[in-house]
């Protein structure tokens, strides 16, 4: 079982940047050493958003975007390597999630698509890449998501305390870590995605810093109840979703019944939607003693306050307080999953995804030996 330095690369549904993290990984340890966030150019972000909202495109357009994203991921890795004065031979492998542009786990032919050509990353960095993590789980009847609960369990499970780890990215998901019980985890619905989409359309800002705009508004109960009536929220766990479902078009459909709404009131209502749907799922799962929050939503004081209010008796804190960077959690998880793949160890948890069995995940894109690279 190889131990050493791994790099994790994550570009999530929030599209707020490419997270790259360097960690030393052994059988008993994941030690983060460095990280950075690499910007996603506006034009590429707009193309990704268009695909996720169902706009048509040619195979040529998709292929070009796949290549450009692969090169962008490689640039992000190379920036971290320069920052840390690393050579390709200093890193065992890169675990790259890719950019999800479609995720459809239901139906007669469930499928998911992450783009960002891993061949480009391997060729331009000179480091072996492990990618395409989700489709093996789907081939075994699973949802293909979430995959990070296995990592949460490895690092944050407690021998006696009933914990949940909540990641509030574009989509929010929870991992239940209860002593003596199988790990469970699933998506709860929108995290930051609709909040970010609304403020981007209304104010041209990528996100609502410190929930300043939402805090100026009031929750619109009719709109909130209308959104909560969406049948997805009533689906049993395990379940997963993404931008292809909860997008700006979804928000517009619900808002169309309520003309003349103030922008800040909509923002406040979207924050409440995120908090309510998370808290309901936490309670349906039996609750927890400690809720550890990571992702961009952990820096949203309104969301954190509402979660604490909706979950009395639960200590709501961040994973940073438990020693794991909330901003880098998912990138770290995919570095760890790459380590497991190369070690021949399963990366999914059937109790989380619904797969018929645990399996080694991903495909390996080997780097050329140093003597073969110019």
From Swiss-Prot:
<dbReference type="GO" id="GO:0006040">
    <property type="term" value="P:amino sugar metabolic process"/>
</dbReference>
<dbReference type="GO" id="GO:0016773">
    <property type="term" value="F:phosphotransferase activity, alcohol group as acceptor"/>
</dbReference>
<dbReference type="InterPro" id="IPR005338">
    <property type="entry name" value="Anhydro_N_Ac-Mur_kinase"/>
</dbReference>
<protein>
    <recommendedName>
        <fullName>Anhydro-N-acetylmuramic acid kinase</fullName>
        <ecNumber>2.7.1.170</ecNumber>
    </recommendedName>
</protein>
<keyword id="KW-0067">ATP-binding</keyword>
<dbReference type="GO" id="GO:0005524">
    <property type="term" value="F:ATP binding"/>
</dbReference>
<comment type="pathway">
    <text>Amino-sugar metabolism; 1,6-anhydro-N-acetylmuramate degradation.</text>
</comment>
<dbReference type="InterPro" id="IPR043129">
    <property type="entry name" value="ATPase_NBD"/>
</dbReference>
<dbReference type="GO" id="GO:0097175">
    <property type="term" value="P:1,6-anhydro-N-acetyl-beta-muramic acid catabolic process"/>
</dbReference>
<comment type="similarity">
    <text>Belongs to the anhydro-N-acetylmuramic acid kinase family.</text>
</comment>
<dbReference type="Pfam" id="PF03702">
    <property type="entry name" value="AnmK"/>
</dbReference>
<keyword id="KW-0547">Nucleotide-binding</keyword>
<feature type="binding site">
    <location>
        <begin position="12"/>
        <end position="19"/>
    </location>
    <ligand>
        <name>ATP</name>
    </ligand>
</feature>
<comment type="pathway">
    <text>Cell wall biogenesis; peptidoglycan recycling.</text>
</comment>
<dbReference type="GO" id="GO:0009254">
    <property type="term" value="P:peptidoglycan turnover"/>
</dbReference>
<dbReference type="GO" id="GO:0016301">
    <property type="term" value="F:kinase activity"/>
</dbReference>
<comment type="function">
    <text>Catalyzes the specific phosphorylation of 1,6-anhydro-N-acetylmuramic acid (anhMurNAc) with the simultaneous cleavage of the 1,6-anhydro ring, generating MurNAc-6-P. Is required for the utilization of anhMurNAc either imported from the medium or derived from its own cell wall murein, and thus plays a role in cell wall recycling.</text>
</comment>
<keyword id="KW-0119">Carbohydrate metabolism</keyword>
<keyword id="KW-0808">Transferase</keyword>
<keyword id="KW-0418">Kinase</keyword>
